A protein has these predicted regions:
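Aromatic "clamp/platform" in nucleotide-sugar-dependent glycosyltransferases that forms part
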Residues: 247, 266
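A conserved mid-protein helix/loop that constitutes part of the nucleotide-sugar donor-binding site
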Residues: 20-31, 186, 190-209, 224-230, ...
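Short His-centered aromatic/hydrophobic patch
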Residues: 91-97, 113
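Conserved acidic donor-binding segment of nucleotide-sugar-dependent glycosyltransferases
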Residues: 298-310, 319-324
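Short hydrophobic beta-strand element within catalytic cores of glycosyltransferases
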Residues: 283-286, 296
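Nucleotide-sugar donor phosphate/pyrophosphate-binding loop at the beta->alpha transition
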Residues: 71-75, 108, 117-139
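N-terminal strand-loop element at the rim of the active site
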Residues: 12-72, 223
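Carbohydrate-associated surface elements
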Residues: 149, 171
Length: 361
């Protein structure tokens, strides 16, 4: 594929500045666009994403998109787009997409969807979100779904026009691959924001099952469920085998200290952490939800179990750790699959192709 013209200018908008999947994706995409000769500008709320953009030399503008900022954000985004002379505006997530739609920048809008479900039990909230998504899908020239699971949600639940949906998997900068011929121990790692949807409680409960009694668990990440997870570890009698490590800055080092990665999410539209672990050569066992099955291609590059099933998670993992041949095969397969399907370079090329579709550049 040919590259975009070197003078193409892109405004990337996201309403989240945390160190989670969406902001990580936007930062990686901005780096890929810059490397290809485009000029990206990230617009996001104050927070860690702003700081990381500045550290990496990515142009960034900080603006509030909640509270009082909700009302003023469309005007500020329109001004920002015009000052940047954006040839395309690209929103990520419903809040950013809605604000950018209301901004009426005059530039074609691409919107990336990062959810494959409603994530609320309230019928009223579902109805509101469905309406907002339908309006957004009509307003944006093209939609990007980060997995087939997200694309199916858009067409089946939201009613999006499948002809205007492009599936582009999130991409990562692969970690250095260290092939493993056998596990050094029985250390399992979970790297996630500590929220209910990530299923970290399932990982803790897995240690209390018969198959999990020989396992130790390293938990990297922060979030609102920390206290409840610590209490759970004591309640089920596994606190001596659970290490809460807090925010992890060096993911390569984290994975090097594990023999297996778990991604026990209850819902996962994509699953960047699975890609990161696989790229390092660390075998992965994950929930059979959302984009995780697409990433792992079980049983070739990873293993999956039914979600919210601690016994199955522990049993499958113990079996893998006791099978050096299969363990080594998964360790070897992971980096190659990430290189072919989930690299940041591939994501950047395909995303620039979408920009060409809507701009003609």
């Amino acid at each position: 594929m040919s590259a975009m013209r070197t003078d193409s200018r892109v405004l990337l908008v996201i309403a989240d500045s945390s160190r989670s999947g969406g902001p990580e994706h936007v930062l990686t995409l901005a780096q890929e666009l810059s490397a290809a000769g485009s000029s990206p500008l990230v617009a996001c709320p104050p927070g860690e994403l702003v700081e990381r953009c500045r550290e990496l030399g990515v142009a960034v503008s900080s603006l509030s998109m909640r509270g009082r900022g909700w009302a003023s954000a469309p005007v500020r985004l329109r001004q920002l787009s015009r000052r940047w002379q954006a040839s395309v505006v690209h929103s990520h997530g419903l809040r950013a997409g809605t604000l950018l739609r209301r901004a009426r920048t005059g530039a074609p809008q691409v919107h990336s969807h990062h959810l494959d479900g409603w994530f609320t039990a309230s019928p009223l909230r579902v109805a509101i979100h469905r309406h907002e998504l339908r309006v957004l899908c009509r307003a944006a020239q093209l939609q990007i779904a980060v997995s087939n699971a997200v694309a199916e949600f858009l067409t089946d639940e939201v009613g999006a026009d499948s002809r205007r949906v492009r599936v582009i998997a999130n991409g990562i900068h692969p970690l250095p691959a260290v092939p493993r011929t056998a596990p050094d121990g029985r250390r399992v790692g979970v790297l996630a924001r500590l929220t209910q949807s990530k299923g970290v409680d399932i990982a803790i409960l897995a240690l209390a099952t018969p198959a999990g009694r020989s396992l130790t668990l390293n938990i990297g990440g922060a979030g609102p469920e920390l206290a409840a997870l610590v209490d759970l570890a004591f309640t089920v009698g596994v606190a001596d085998r659970v290490n809460f490590l807090g925010e992890v800055r060096d993911r390569e080092q984290f994975f090097a200290g594990c023999d297996l990665a778990w991604v026990p999410s209850r819902a996962e539209p994509f699953g960047l952490v699975a890609c990161e672990a696989m790229s390092s050569g660390l075998p992965v066992v994950a929930s059979r939800v959302g984009g995780l099955t697409e990433i792992l291609d079980p049983p070739l590059a990873g293993l999956v179990v039914m979600p919210a099933n601690p016994a199955a998670l522990a049993s499958v993992s113990a079996g893998l750790l006791d099978d050096p041949e299969r363990y080594a095969a998964l360790s070897a397969a992971g980096p190659e699959r990430v290189r072919r399907r989930f690299s940041s370079t591939r994501m950047g090329v395909l995303t620039r192709g979408v920009y060409r579709e809507v701009t003609g550049l």
